[in-house]
């Protein structure tokens, strides 16, 4: 099947860009923080960014389904397309004014990711990848490192919220 990747990518960028404006506007403001779990935060900025993303995607692609972090599943009209949204990836960082946050949006077709967009609104960097077409940073092609040995590579990671329940698993890394 041929996908209208240009249209989908443009909608994702428009949604991420508007959500990024919300995040930047809130950056130096007091934060309203709620807890979904002991270490799982949500802010009014998460909710506002998510609302904006959903609004854009529903307007541009009304038949698509949406899975959003704060609102759960919003189903379109029997679509094989589903957007997966984290409106403020790095909420804990945002809550502590640590400048490592992003808007993350992906598009699935029949449960296969075909498009991903990660926008850092503080640096105004937009990473985009399309299945089978590679990845870009601000529309310039990027490539992976040529290093092929793990002990010579630079690695960075974060640990998920279940890290306490699965400490043995994560310590093996």
Regions found by a protein language model. Give the residues of each.
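Glycine/small-residue-rich loop that forms an oxyanion/phosphate-binding "nest" at active or ligand-binding sites
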Residues: 82, 94, 105
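Conserved structural elements of the adenylate-forming
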Residues: 98-102
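Short loop/turn motifs at secondary-structure junctions and domain boundaries
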Residues: 75-78, 97, 109-111, 119
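N-terminal subdomain of lithium-sensitive/metallo-dependent phosphomonoesterases centered on the IMPase/IPPase/PAP
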Residues: 1-88
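Acidic beta-strand-loop-alpha-helix segment within the catalytic core
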Residues: 106-173
């Amino acid at each position: 099947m041929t996908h209208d990747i240009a249209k989908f990518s443009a909608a994702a960028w428009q949604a991420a860009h508007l959500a990024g404006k919300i995040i930047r506007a809130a950056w130096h403001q007091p934060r309203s923080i709620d807890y979904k779990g002991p270490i799982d935060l949500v802010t009014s900025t998460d909710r506002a960014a998510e609302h904006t993303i959903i609004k854009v995607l529903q307007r541009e692609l009304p038949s698509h389904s949406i899975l959003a972090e704060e609102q759960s599943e919003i189903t379109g009209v029997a679509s094989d397309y589903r957007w997966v949204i984290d409106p403020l990836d790095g909420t804990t960082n945002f809550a502590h004014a640590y400048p490592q946050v992003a808007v993350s949006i992906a598009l699935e077709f029949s449960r296969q990711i075909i498009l991903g967009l990660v926008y850092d609104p503080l640096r105004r960097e937009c990473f985009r990848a399309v299945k089978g077409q590679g990845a870009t940073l601000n529309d310039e092609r990027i490539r992976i490192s040529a290093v092929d040995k793990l002990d010579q590579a630079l690695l960075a990671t974060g640990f998920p919220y279940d890290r306490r329940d699965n400490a043995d698993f994560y310590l093996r890394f």
